[in-house]
Regions:
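Alpha-helical membrane insertion/targeting regions
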Residues: 1-201
């Protein structure tokens, strides 16, 4: 399964972000490193949750499909926010002075994700519960990243992660992904029904 590589990859992005922050590499990491850290951590938590539940309910088609379809939705913010920064009037970045527009573009992209979740829920109601789970994580990301965008509270943690060996962080992410796959698969196994005992005549 490729899921451990996804979580390991997200952990690698955290590693690059933290090491760039410690090295003072680039104004974006210096401005938003803490916010990116919490956003990525919540993304990992979201993926672990929806993938575990997708495996657990793999015998229930609607639930399984719903959780699997939330995975690209969680990824949607990253490319769409970059498109906003490239082309959207009022959010387009033309120079260093426009870098503070990065966070509003991320929040607008997440707001669009929530609009998609709302539209799916209005159409399918109880069958769309997996999207409500993903929506809860998206709301948590919006609040955490919006509040902590310029906060110094996460800086000590970011420095600590930046000073860790990269392999430790990436392999931890890989292990979390592997453990999630194993746990979800086992949770979805059919319960063994004991064979009836033949009665003596």
């Amino acid at each position: 399964m490729l899921f451990p590589f996804l979580i390991g990859g997200l952990a690698a992005i955290i590693d690059v972000t933290a090491k760039g922050f410690v090295a003072g590499d680039g104004p974006v990491r210096m401005m938003f490193g803490g916010s990116f850290l919490i956003g990525l951590a919540l993304a990992i938590a979201a993926y672990v949750t929806v993938y575990y539940r997708a495996l657990k309910y793999r015998r229930k088609v609607w639930i399984h499909a719903g959780y699997m379809l939330t995975t690209p939705l969680i990824l949607f913010e990253s490319p769409f926010s970059r498109l906003l920064n490239a082309f959207m009037p009022g959010l387009a970045i033309r120079g260093v002075e426009d870098l503070p527009l990065i966070m509003p573009s991320i929040l607008w992209a997440m707001a669009l994700e929530l609009a998609i979740v709302a539209a799916i829920w209005l159409r399918y109601r109880e069958k769309a519960n997996p999207f409500l789970v993903a929506g809860g994580f998206i709301v948590a990301q919006m609040v955490a990243m919006g509040v902590l965008a310029y906060s110094p509270l996460l800086m000590p943690l970011l420095r600590a992660i930046g000073n860790m060996p990269s392999a430790v962080l990436v392999m931890t992410g890989f292990a979390i992904g592997a453990a999630t796959s194993w746990a979800g698969w086992n949770a979805g196994k059919r319960a063994l029904v004991p064979a009836p005992v033949a009665q003596a005549v």
